[in-house]
């Protein structure tokens, strides 16, 4: 009877993953592609699955495919803060417990996401098709930075914080951000960032006003619709060959009992959760970094009543991405040299500079350069960096989990006490048994 009940429960439970659904995440074609990728390229890089980015945030492939994504209740707060507040990443989910595979090309470049699994036949800005199997294709990111690299371009944190958020994207693509106490000189920021004029933004706002149920008050839009709406709007100027950076403030507290709201542009979604939601995502500031723009935008507004204001827009030319790759020297290493708690490799540089790992900063690391331990810094707001002189060097990073040594000592002491207690208990019981026999 229990077996019958268990069977009926499982076949009717819609929350269980069915075999056909599992095939979307793991199948022979996907396995073939990841195996082919790792066999052809044994260097150290990250990958991501664009076909199922949320369901596969914690899913590794082939044992040597590293990820920049994680869904967990415990995570590195410094890295999480960087993920949610730098590089114009979108926030498309209802909480801040996930570091998902966003659609932001700059983020994937910066984090060393070299290979992307997607459906075949796509034309993707910055990517080239590499391998194909069945309905799937591995695309190579032509601009992906190494996970570990050296550069002689940097600015101080003080200068970085004086820049607006779009200028900060350019800073991070042009060099590294150093703590004030170690940034003795600074690079000059390129002048490639272009601000979209107020007149051009006004033209777009007028188009939105004509196409959507909105009420305008200057540059503020009040959106009120019972159904989601999607329309394609024209831009006053083509953005082909450029990155388009957009930001805006969104407020869904203008009416009582508001639900979640979202705005999606060219398939990139930002969501603001209902004010009453217990895991509120605090995403009042929507940012988009678009790499597939020509002279139109596909714009979607969710149902609800909410306000949009403070709209800003910028463009960056593609050459910024090319220069970002050209001005760094990669760490020579393989996936096999990045195992367990150790990262090792060699690097040769012509100038004094800094070595950076796009690995989240933590106090548990030790690093040696040519066998000599070196102090490291928190660079680029959330990552690991060390000064590095010109020449050829062997670098080894080792991670020691905070509290691990203390935990091992406590475990050994506890085990010793248990053994002592067991021995004493056995001795006492034996003596008591002998007394009973004698008596």
Question: How should each PLM-predicted stretch be described?
Answer:
Residues 90-136, 142:
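Periplasmic/luminal catalytic loop of GT-C fold multi-pass membrane glycosyltransferases
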Residues 1, 44-47, 114-115, 136-138, ...:
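Beta-sheet entry/capping signal
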Residues 55, 104-107, 114, 127-130, ...:
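Nucleotide-cofactor and metal-assisted catalytic machinery
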Residues 52-53, 117-123, 361-363:
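Short, polar loop motifs at secondary-structure junctions
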Residues 109, 134-209, 307-323:
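Catalytic cores of secreted or luminal carbohydrate-active enzymes
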Residues 3-35, 275-281, 311, 318-329:
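Membrane-proximal, lumen/periplasm-facing interface regions of secretory-pathway glyco-
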Residues 2-17, 35-108, 145, 150-169, ...:
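Extracytoplasmic/lumenal acceptor-recognition loop(s) of multi-pass membrane glycoenzymes
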Residues 200-439:
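Active-site-proximal, structured, solvent-exposed surfaces of multi-pass membrane proteins
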């Amino acid at each position: 009877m229990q077996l019958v009940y268990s069977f009926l429960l499982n076949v009717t439970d819609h929350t269980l993953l069915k075999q056909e659904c599992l095939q979307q995440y793991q199948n022979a074609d996907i396995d073939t592609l990841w195996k082919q990728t790792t066999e052809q390229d044994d260097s150290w890089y990250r990958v991501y699955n664009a076909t199922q980015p949320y369901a596969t945030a914690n899913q590794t492939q082939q044992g040597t495919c590293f990820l920049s994504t994680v869904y967990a209740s415990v995570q590195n707060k410094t890295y999480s803060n960087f993920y949610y507040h730098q590089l114009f990443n979108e926030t498309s989910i209802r909480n801040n417990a996930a570091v998902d595979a966003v659609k932001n090309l700059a983020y994937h470049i910066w984090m060393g996401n070299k290979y992307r699994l997607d459906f075949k036949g796509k034309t993707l800005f910055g990517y080239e098709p590499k391998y194909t199997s069945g309905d799937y294709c591995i695309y190579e990111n032509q601009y992906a930075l190494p996970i570990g690299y050296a550069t002689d371009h940097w600015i101080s944190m003080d200068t970085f914080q004086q820049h607006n958020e779009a200028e900060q994207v350019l800073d991070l693509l042009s060099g590294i951000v150093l703590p004030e106490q170690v940034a003795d000189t600074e690079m000059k920021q390129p002048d490639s960032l272009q601000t979209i004029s107020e007149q051009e933004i006004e033209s777009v706002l007028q188009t939105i006003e004509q196409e959507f149920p909105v009420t305008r008050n200057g540059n503020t839009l009040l959106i009120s619709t019972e159904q989601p709406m999607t329309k394609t709007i024209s831009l006053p100027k083509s953005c082909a060959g450029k990155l388009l950076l957009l930001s805006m403030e969104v407020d869904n507290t203008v009416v009582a009992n508001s639900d979640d709201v979202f705005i999606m542009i060219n398939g990139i979604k930002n969501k603001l959760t209902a004010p009453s939601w217990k895991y509120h995502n605090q995403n009042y500031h929507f940012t988009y970094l678009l790499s597939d723009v020509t002279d139109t935008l596909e714009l979607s507004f969710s149902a609800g009543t909410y306000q949009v204001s403070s709209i800003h827009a910028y463009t960056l030319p593609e050459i910024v991405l090319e220069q970002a790759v050209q001005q760094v020297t990669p760490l020579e290493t393989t996936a096999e040299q990045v195992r367990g708690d150790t990262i090792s490799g060699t690097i040769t540089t012509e100038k004094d500079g800094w070595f950076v790992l796009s690995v989240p900063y933590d106090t548990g690391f030790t690093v040696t350069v040519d066998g000599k331990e070196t102090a490291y810094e928190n660079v680029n707001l959330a990552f690991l960096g060390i000064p590095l002189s010109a020449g050829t060097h062997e670098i080894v990073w080792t991670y020691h989990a905070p509290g691990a040594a203390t935990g091992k000592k406590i475990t050994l002491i506890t085990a010793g006490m248990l053994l002592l207690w067991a021995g004493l208990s056995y001795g006492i019981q034996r003596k008591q048994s002998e007394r009973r026999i004698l008596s």
